[in-house]
Swiss-Prot record:
GO terms for cellular component: cytoplasm. InterPro entries: CarD-like/TRCF_RID, CarD-like/TRCF_RID_sf, DEAD/DEAH_box_helicase_dom, Helicase_ATP-bd, Helicase_C-like, Mfd, P-loop_NTPase, RecG/Mfd. The gene is mfd. PANTHER family: ATP-DEPENDENT DNA HELICASE HOMOLOG RECG, CHLOROPLASTIC. Its main location: cytoplasm. One of its GO terms (biological process) is regulation of DNA-templated transcription. Its EC number is 3.6.4.-. It is found in: Cytoplasm. The keyword Cytoplasm applies. A motif (DEEQ box) lies at residues 748-751. ATP binds at G647, D648, V649, G650, Y651, G652, K653, T654. This is Transcription-repair-coupling factor. GO terms for molecular function: ATP binding; damaged DNA binding; DNA helicase activity; hydrolase activity. Couples transcription and DNA repair by recognizing RNA polymerase (RNAP) stalled at DNA lesions. Mediates ATP-dependent release of RNAP and its truncated transcript from the DNA, and recruitment of nucleotide excision repair machinery to the damaged site.
């Protein structure tokens, strides 16, 4: 596609005229549609291969044009400098994604790389780190290089990296012995091993496993922030800030001088710990003696392109006014200083004066710039066919008759084949090999994607996209980084931190106090220290650590500690045991009943089904495809389906359900779609109508929004079989509704229905296929324990290229709120304003009305009548209101694609899972969503709230906040799946133990034996210092992780693997660790030899075999193999168990390892008869 369109364009006279003067003189290029403009700009860049700067009026336009340019130019050569046109951004946690794009761009420019650089106006004006300072902090490390370690680590801190004990997030580094781990903003995490001061090796590593992968010869370490802050910068900042404070103080009202002092003190406080880059970026205008702007980073001969100049000047005016108003308000309220700012206003004008500029505009209009050339292109939009095949046929025939070359761009190879066969059926010849010479009058169908098609008549070229053919949007964008799977999100909530609650299988709920090395009888060992009720403490040897689990329960619940030796824990466990057995019985009975009952068996997919599925405008995610296959598989079996489909909000459950519904209708069955609220019913009804508009399917709605007459007609239609699909609330469960032939019941969020309705659903389940949808994730552990008892399908992957919601955590401030509201309303969007106090919610509306006099503002809360609430919500969905001031009632279920800003007051009072779900309300269309989590200014937060806010900040990446939210949602999901009353039981023993007990109960009822090794746990008691010293592994989490791995070792290969990991992560190990590994090695052989006990008796070592091993051992072989030990070994039999005694010598440990290996080998050889 690239070469073909490029050839056409490069041979055109207008393009050649443009090419001659581009970059030499000021030119105006008019008449090109957005995608045609991107095509011309990309072609010019590819021809010259110089630095090219493309300025747009905002980030949204930059994103749009980037997407089109990426169709032609390799993404390694396309750079964007993404900056929001929003002051609030400077005052909040930065999005790592936007930050990494900015750093990538600045680094490429500083290194003089060629590339096409797309910059929104706001990015162009920002004050930046001086170019020389930036260059000085670009580091390349090579194997064999000598480094000053202290200076190197200091540089990392200047560059915005944070030092941690274990590296798990972008922007962190750690030092352990001679090993430095770094997780750069761009690229993979790296592990640098030093030999004294020389770089001995560089390896990339996996943050999940902490293991190294491949050796690399060199690594580039980019900064972790777009500002470099050195000691000198801090010194300069302190001096300038002091001057600004002293200058501002007398110029503001006396009433706010104290506030100004507090603001000043808060910055000084942070300077002492200095490098909080997030905070100090607000003071960029005081940081550097000579700050740079982006133009300073470009080469002198860079080509400059300006997109829609008049629109940029408009944006510049608005931006200047906004910034000035914002800063004035900040200064007047004592929250800012005179001289504080973020941008150089005149930088854009300076750019235009210093360079020859190519201005692109769609229409010719007067511009206040000198122009030497005007080049007019004639470009027409393409007819929108939207699946109207007659119009499509005649238009394509016209193109062919007029000798046009037609290029049809589609997303995938499969679609190429589909479109080709469709056009061939219309008798329109197509070509698929784009490398052939294409003549006029031919249609080429090829893979590719632009935001829209275009026609260049004088070139006789027309480009048509899927958007014109079928009304689908283009989706090709720069690939985003892989999203973390649910399993990985949840994995690290198991990490134990000091102070965490734990559950000991035998002793109950306690508190984890850390790992402690104790001396017991002259030997040092590590123990897990646990606190119980009162002053009780328990030291658990690390080799028994599998009896200790992290206590996980509903959010913010602190459990009661158990008393050591008390009976309370035994009683609690017995109650839970009874409860899980009851559940297991119920599940097994349901399962058996379903296996025996006979339902309708659907046929294979029809041709209509395939056509219907092809109409879906997006690519399915792998999880969606798998779920659809599982559901169809169930429908094609004789027993009734009862499947639960879980997937996060917006992950595409509805499409899966719609396909199942269509399949049922094609087989002559009726479908009932049951939803918990009237609004959801309306939304699902509209989705079904839109998806099935081209097929003969009769769809009706039963809800309060329907008249009595309409509902009566629907009921008659259901009874007669005229209605195929009915969507509705619990009204569908009424006795007065009769179906002619109901085949499929789809239930959305079953847990939101009352007991009576659930009972009715249960009776329907007996002979109808049922598909239940839920947005609450089901925990994997629970998923595993229910395998074979409950059919579950899980959608864990989000749709490709869904924009991540930009999340800001900010102190509450009227300026921020006003800016956020204005920004959303100016793009004709809507806002959810979350205020969780019903008693003063109307006052809040009045406040916002004063702030935004022209906005229509509605209120929604749980104390309104159901009718009022639904009508308000519906009006909001229909865009009759701009802002909805609401309580958490919007947490589930409402889909308002046009509402893409969420503001939450007092976010510190919400639970993480709540915040996570609320945030899922925005960013659900093709626009970027914004979430502002506000917390009261100057409020002293309690520890939990502070932790929670810290965690919310990490929501901007897939950080631990995400994992905790997932944890809480999973527990909620468990409660929903097993019934609300189980919540209490889960909380009483902790989620993990509960899941384990449930799995054991289900397996026992199904007659599945637990796989347990024949050999019991081997006791090895040797007088050796065998542990992981704190000097070797500082992180307690890492220690526990290694102990867990050693506990699971069953083969020599696994042991070698742990040894490799220790050397890889922590360098060569000391003697205490070597002894620990020796003991594990002895255990491995003892396990396979049937040894029960190895005990140090002081002068000798006693080894006792199990009675079975005593029977199986080949004694003759043992004596033959152990001859080198001579008299040091004695063998006897006591109580049917072989008893081996080894007298200790200097080398007794080696002798013991040898002896245990000999016993194992003697097991494998049978006595000769």
């Amino acid at each position: 596609m690239k070469s073909m369109i490029a050839n056409y364009i490069s041979e055109d006279n207008r393009f050649q005229e443009l090419d001659e003067v581009f970059g030499q003189e000021n030119i105006l290029v008019t008449g090109l549609s957005p995608s045609a403009k991107a095509t011309i700009i990309a072609e010019k860049y590819l021809k010259d291969h110089k630095q090219m700067l493309l300025v747009t009026n905002n980030l949204y336009q930059a994103d749009k044009i980037e997407t089109d340019i990426l169709q032609y130019v390799d993404d390694s050569e396309v750079y964007k400098y993404p900056v929001q046109d929003i002051m609030t951004e400077e005052f909040s946690t930065q999005s790592p994604q936007l930050m990494s794009e900015r750093v990538r761009t600045l680094t490429a420019l500083a290194q003089g790389e060629k590339g096409l650089f797309i910059v929104p106006l706001n990015g162009f004006k920002k004050w930046l780190t001086p170019v020389d300072l930036w260059k000085d902090h670009q580091m390349t490390l090579k194997v064999g290089q000598d480094i000053d370690v202290d200076a190197f680590l200091n540089k990392l801190v200047n560059m915005g990296y944070r030092r941690e004990s274990v590296v798990s997030h972008i922007g962190e580094f750690s030092l352990r012995g001679g090993i430095i781990d770094i997780y750069p903003l761009i690229g993979t995490p790296v592990r640098i091993e030093l030999f004294d001061t020389e770089v001995d090796s560089i390896r990339d590593f996996d943050v999940e496993t902490q293991r190294s992968n491949d050796n690399i010869n060199q690594v580039e370490i980019t900064t972790a922030s777009d500002y470099i802050i050195t000691d000198e910068v801090i010194q300069h900042l302190q001096n300038e800030l002091k001057k600004a404070y002293e200058y501002t103080r007398p110029k503001i009202e006396k009433s706010v001088r104290n506030d100004l002092k507090e603001t000043y003190e808060s910055f000084k406080l942070f300077e002492s710990t200095f490098f909080d880059h997030q905070l100090l970026r607000r003071l960029v205008s005081f940081m550097y003696e000579k700050p740079s702007t982006l133009i300073d980073y470009f080469q002198k001969n860079a080509i400059i392109v300006v997109d829609e100049f008049n629109r940029i000047k408009e944006t510049e005016e608005t931006l200047t006014t906004e910034v000035e108003d914002f800063m004035s308000n900040l200064i007047e309220s004592g929250n800012g200083f005179i001289g504080q700012g973020f941008m150089k206003y005149e930088s854009f004008d300076a750019l235009l004066e210093q360079h020859a500029v190519a201005y692109f505009t769609l229409f010719t209009s007067s511009m206040q710039v000198p122009l030497q050339h005007i080049i007019k292109f004639s470009c027409k939009p393409v007819q929108q066919f939207y699946g109207q095949y007659d119009i499509m046929r005649s238009e394509f025939q016209r193109y062919v008759h007029q000798d046009y070359t037609v290029v049809v761009l589609v997303e995938t190879e499969t679609k190429v084949e589909r479109i080709q066969s469709m056009l061939n059926e219309m008798h329109i010849p197509t070509v698929s090999n784009i490398h052939e010479d294409i003549d006029g009058g031919q249609v080429v169908v090829t893979e590719g994607s632009l935001s829209e098609g275009f026609e260049l008549p004088y070139m006789q070229l027309v480009v048509i996209t899927e958007r014109e053919l079928f009304k689908t949007r283009q989706k090709k964008q720069r690939k985003r980084t892989k999203t973390i799977s649910n399993a990985e999100k949840i994995k690290s909530y198991q990490d134990l931190n000091v102070g965490d609650y734990i559950v000991h299988v035998h002793h109950g709920v306690g508190r984890y106090l850390g790992v402690e090395t104790l001396e017991v009888g002259d030997t040092h060992r590590d123990y897990i220290k646990l606190q119980y009720k009162g002053t009780d403490q328990l030291f658990v040897p690390v080799d028994q650590m599998d009896q200790v689990q992290k206590y996980v329960a509903s959010e913010d619940k602190s459990p009661r500690l158990n008393k050591l030796g008390g009976t309370e824990w035994k009683k609690t466990k017995a109650k839970v045991q009874q409860s899980v057995e009851d559940i297991a019985d119920e599940l097994i009975d349901l399962y058996k009943e379903r296996e025996m009952s006979v339902g309708y068996q659907y046929g294979q997919d029809t041709a209509e089904q395939s056509a219907f599925e092809h109409d879906f405008p997006y690519e399915l995610t792998p999880d969606q495809s798998k779920s659809i296959d599982e559901i169809k598989g169930d429908m094609e079996r004789a027993r009734p389906m009862d499947r639960l489909l879980c997937g996060d909000v917006g992950y595409g459950k509805t499409e899966v359900a719609v396909r199942a519904a269509f399949k049922a209708v094609m087989d002559g069955k009726q479908v009932a779609f049951l939803v918990p609220t009237t609004i959801l019913a309306q939304q699902h009804y509209e989705t079904l109508l839109e998806r099935m508009q081209d097929f003969p399917v009769e769809i009706q709605l039963v809800s309060r929004f329907r008249t009595a007459k309409e509902i009566r007609e629907t009921k008659e239609g259901l009874k007669s079989g005229y209605v195929d699909i009915v969507v509705g609330t619990h009204k569908l469960l009424g006795k007065d509704i009769q179906y002619k032939d109901l085949g499929l019941l789809i239930v959305d969020e079953e847990q939101r229905f009352g007991v009576r309705h659930k009972e009715r659903i249960k009776t329907l389940k007996k002979n109808v296929d049922v598909l239940t949808l839920t947005a609450t994730p089901i925990p994997r552990t629970l998923h595993m324990s229910m395998l074979g008892v409950r059919d579950l399908s899980v959608i864990e992957t989000p749709p490709e290229n869904r924009f991540p919601v930009q999340t800001y955590v900010l102190e509450q401030n009227t300026n921020f709120i006003k800016e956020a509201l204005e920004r959303e309303l100016s793009r004709d969007g809507q806002v959810f304003y979350l205020y969780n106090k019903v008693q003063s919610i109307y006052e809040k509306r009045e406040q916002l009305q004063r702030l935004m006099p022209d906005a229509n503002i509605a209120v929604a809360h749980g104390q309104m009548t159901e009718r009022d609430l639904e009508e308000t919500m519906l009006s909001f969905i229909n865009h009759e209101y701009d802002i909805l001031v609401t309580t958490t009632i919007i947490e589930t279920g409402v889909d308002v694609p046009n509402a893409n800003t969420l503001i939450i007051e007092e976010a510190d009072r919400f639970g993480l899972s709540q915040l996570y779900q609320l945030r899922g309300r925005v960013g659900r269309s093709s626009r970027i969503g914004y979430a502002y989590f506000l917390h009261p200014a100057n409020k002293v937060l309690n520890e939990t709230a502070e932790e929670r806010l810290q965690t919310i900040k990490e929501f901007t990446e897939l950080g631990s906040g995400f994992k905790i939210a997932m944890r809480d949602l999973n527990i909620r999901g468990a409660g929903n799946l097993l019934g609300k009353q189980q919540h209490g039981f889960i909380d009483s023993v902790g989620f993990d133990l509960y899941s384990q007990m449930l799995e054991e109960a289900v397996n026992e009822k199904r007659g599945i034996k637990e796989e347990s090794p024949d050999a019991p746990d081997i006791e090895v008691e040797l007088h050796l210092d065998a542990y992981l010293p704190a000097e070797y592994i500082q992180s307690e989490q890492a220690k526990i992780e290694i102990y867990k791995k050693l506990r699971k070792v069953e083969t020599e290969e696994q042991l070698f693997d742990v040894k490799d990991e220790l050397i890889d992560r922590f360098n060569d190990y000391p003697i205490e660790v070597e002894r620990l590994l020796d003991i594990v090695e002895i255990k491995v052989h003892a396990l396979h030899a049937g040894v029960e006990l190895i005990k140090d008796k002081g002068k000798s070592i006693q080894i006792i075999l199990s009675p079975k091993a005593t029977e199986d051992i080949n004694g003759e072989e043992l004596f033959k193999q152990t001859q080198p030990l001579g008299r040091a070994m004695k063998v006897g039999v006591q109580n049917n168990a072989m008893n081996v005694t080894l007298t200790k010598s200097k080398q007794w440990l080696d002798s013991l390892k040898f002896l245990v290996r000999c016993i194992e080998e003697s097991m494998a050889i049978k006595d000769e008869d």
